[in-house]
């Protein structure tokens, strides 16, 4: 299964790392300096309880193109950012979209993507 985690904040990075550690084919969509940092040095996450930093060499992309194909896209963005990516999701051929977060507009988000299988989830770290 080919997975894209769309969003490289705290929750998105943790989700991508967990998929990666489980042996899944995961790619992380990140932008700007953060994308360059992950590409160069790997995804580095400081352990909450132990004095260590894990490094995961997760593939990184900086955009989602219409022709990119994934089995599922996990969208892990702030609520205020969701409106800016709906057209990108509509144009992409991936059918399965999971919005991870508070999902205060769940019905509206699903209605905005009528050709997609839209699901909602809440992440725990």
Report the location of each language-model feature.
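NAD(P)+-binding Rossmann beta1-loop-alpha1 motif at the extreme N-terminus of oxidoreductases
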Residues: 1-50
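Rossmann-like NAD(P)(H) cofactor-binding subdomain of soluble oxidoreductases
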Residues: 53-125
């Amino acid at each position: 299964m080919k997975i894209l985690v769309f969003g490289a904040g705290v929750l998105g990075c943790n989700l991508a790392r967990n998929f990666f550690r489980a042996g899944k084919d995961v790619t992380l969509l990140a932008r700007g300096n953060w994308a360059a940092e992950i590409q160069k040095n790997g995804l580095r996450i400081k352990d909450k309880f132990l004095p260590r930093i894990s490094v995961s060499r997760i593939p990184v992309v900086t955009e989602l193109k219409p022709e990119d194909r994934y089995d599922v896209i996990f969208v892990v963005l702030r609520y205020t950012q969701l409106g800016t990516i709906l057209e990108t999701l509509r144009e992409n051929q991936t059918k399965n979209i999971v919005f991870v977060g508070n999902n205060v507009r769940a019905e509206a988000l699903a209605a905005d993507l009528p050709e997609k299988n839209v699901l909602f989830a809440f992440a725990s770290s």
